[in-house]
């Protein structure tokens, strides 16, 4: 009673297809696939944009002590 057999899942699938129809299920699948693809692309773009910003911060370090020494003179 704890797990469902393949027959239970087939019956559920048939009922869902009768209630929603195949066209609506296809549209839901396409929307879900597009959302997953957009999420993956966004994650890839986020990683690419973060890497150059980190390199930029490392290369533009300002020596604060040097500015204070020149002001005192």
UniProtKB/Swiss-Prot annotation:
Function of the molecule: Part of the twin-arginine translocation (Tat) system that transports large folded proteins containing a characteristic twin-arginine motif in their signal peptide across membranes. TatA could form the protein-conducting channel of the Tat system.
Oligomer status and interactors: The Tat system comprises two distinct complexes: a TatABC complex, containing multiple copies of TatA, TatB and TatC subunits, and a separate TatA complex, containing only TatA subunits. Substrates initially bind to the TatABC complex, which probably triggers association of the separate TatA complex to form the active translocon.
Record keywords, A-Z: Cell inner membrane, Cell membrane, Membrane, Protein transport, Translocation, Transmembrane, Transmembrane helix, Transport
Ranges annotated as spanning the membrane: 1-21
Protein name from the UniProt record: Sec-independent protein translocase protein TatA
GO MF annotations, alphabetized: protein transmembrane transporter activity
Pfam families in the cross-refs: TatA_B_E
Organism expressing this protein natively: Cupriavidus pinatubonensis (strain JMP 134 / LMG 1197)
Lineage start: Bacteria, Pseudomonadati, Pseudomonadota, Betaproteobacteria, Burkholderiales
């Amino acid at each position: 009673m704890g797990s469902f057999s393949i027959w239970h899942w087939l019956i559920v699938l048939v009922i869902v297809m009768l209630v929603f129809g195949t066209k609506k299920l296809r549209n839901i699948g396409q929307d879900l696939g597009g959302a997953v693809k957009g999420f993956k692309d966004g994650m890839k773009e986020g990683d690419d944009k973060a890497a150059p910003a980190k390199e930029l911060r490392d290369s533009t370090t300002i020596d604060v002590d040097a500015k204070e020494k020149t002001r005192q003179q």
